[in-house]
Amino acid sequence: MAFLKKSLFLVLFLGLVSLSICEEEKRETEEEEYNQEDDDKSEEKRFLSLIPTAINAVSALAKHFG
């Protein structure tokens, strides 16, 4: 009977360890996806902030040559 209890305890322990590892990997994946979304948004903001500068430069060149 003691052997059965030890075996059951071992199976439950190993199951909990593997479940914990899976949850940790899932959290890391979710964090990476969230960080990637933030990076994409910041790149978009940087690009959008360059548009007025580019328009001003083009209009200045047009005035200079036109």
Curated annotation (Swiss-Prot):
Keywords: Amidation, Amphibian defense peptide, Antibiotic, Antimicrobial, Cleavage on pair of basic residues, Secreted, Signal. It is found in: Secreted. It comes from the Eukaryota. Residues 1-22 form the signal peptide. The modification Phenylalanine amide is found at F65. GO terms for biological process: defense response to bacterium. Expressed by the skin glands. InterPro entries: Frog_antimicrobial_propeptide, FSAP. GO terms for cellular component: extracellular region. Coiled coil: none annotated. Residues 23-44 form a propeptide. Transmembrane segments: none annotated. Belongs to the frog skin active peptide (FSAP) family. Phylloseptin subfamily. Has antimicrobial activity. This is Phylloseptin-Az3. It comes from Pithecopus azureus.
